[in-house]
Amino acid sequence: MSFSVDVLANIAIELQRGIGHQDRFQRLITTLRQVLECDASALLRYDSRQFIPLAIDGLAKDVLGRRFALEGHPRLEAIARAGDVVRFPADSELPDPYDGLIPGQESLKVHACVGLPLFAGQNLIGALTLDGMQPDQFDVFSDEELRLIAALAAGALSNALLIEQLESQNMMPGDATPFEAVKQTQMIGLSPGMTQLKKEIEIVAASDLNVLISGETGTGKELVAKAIHEASPRAVNPLVYLNCAALPESVAESELFGHVKGAFTGAISNRSGKFEMADNGTLFLDEIGELSLALQAKLLRVLQYGDIQRVGDDRSLRVDVRVLAATNRDLREEVLAGRFRADLFHRLSVFPLSVPPLRERGDDVILLAGYFCEQCRLRLGLSRVVLSAGARNLLQHYRFPGNVRELEHAIHRAVVLARATRNGDEVILEAQHFAFPEVTLPPPEAAAVPVVKQNLREATEAFQRETIRQALAQNHHNWAACARMLETDVANLHRLAKRLGMKD
């Protein structure tokens, strides 16, 4: 088999038809999988010695949340080091990063694997990976044909990176896109709420405005603060963190503004406060709603005039600090109740951001679960950590009152439990490994079975033919995709189709 001009033209057209980078990348991956008839394909971005999935087809959804560090994935490291097409033999001793991550084939190892490194000039910017369950699945394609595919993908990714760079420098108009937020590697999520939040972060980061970040406990407000700082002109200077809820009243003022020697019992030397430490940088005040009214007044003065006084000192010090504040309270209600100053609230909330709770983020829970699974895999030295279909279903229907933090702890606990019940270094997380309160799962849909005047063999074969026809129609007559949907081996499916008279 070889690529025709029409095939290559179709791939190029799909890249142009997409609306936005994410859509173009998905069209590319989906088209490649159909053309190559492979079981799985992925486009990865290279950043800081790790590959970050941008688009996948044929892989479990949680792959989009995983971060593949080269140190833990020798096949990907081999692709990163290569300057050309990499073909891994079926008996390669290097584990495939997608083993167990092809739906319906969790217990099987990937047999055929091709890696295409993507370059912009001499710089590695990403990779295309193609995987199949048959050992010789890609033998029909020459290296030259695969290089053409890599060139198309590299061009699309390179253009996207260039546009991202220009937009971040305000050199061209346009709002941020989900792709541009990939550099915030820990802010995982493609739901509308997270996409909007990432856009707002891109907008406010370039300014010097104070930001009030609100959200329930465990939603990731600190990550939002880090993302703002890292994307701001102050990124070369420190980001200083202070948890206001953990401050005893007796030392809170000293922690914020510092003190001089002898200011109080135990002040044996001069000490800088958080504002001084954050000079020319950013100060993140977590749980700001816990500050006393007296300290709120002093904080307001700093925001108004840009100077501080150490405890026990009459002199003022000028500071240049951007303040990011976070709270899990409704500060408007706190203002009405007299527990928070209205003038401070307005100073802080020049650009308010709201972090959505996990229960409102849809499939983001699966992406985050994949990220935490990969973290556990590296930390515990496991070869793979995979979510079963039942585990994914459970995670999608649990409401997570503790949000992302609860999910992280649940994954870590489940991995430890699953590891204790299996021999070896491969872990599959099942629903029973999660200690959630009772979760009501939707019942499986019952299919109506018509009564026909056929014997059992004829009825069975008729049912098999119709099932295969429907699966083929849904997968554009891609037999590999059809086999995956039906959760059977593609070779067995071909044999069954021949026996049923559906193939020559």
UniProtKB/Swiss-Prot annotation:
InterPro entries: AAA+_ATPase, GAF, GAF-like_dom_sf, Homeodomain-like_sf, NorR, P-loop_NTPase, Sigma_54_int, Sigma_54_int_dom_ATP-bd_1. Residues 479-498 bind DNA. The keyword Nucleotide-binding applies. The modification 4-aspartylphosphate is found at D57. SMART domains: AAA, GAF. GO terms for molecular function: ATP binding; ATP hydrolysis activity; DNA binding; DNA-binding transcription factor activity. Pathway: Nitrogen metabolism; nitric oxide reduction. HAMAP family: NorR. Required for the expression of anaerobic nitric oxide (NO) reductase, acts as a transcriptional activator for at least the norVW operon. Activation also requires sigma-54. This is Anaerobic nitric oxide reductase transcription regulator NorR.
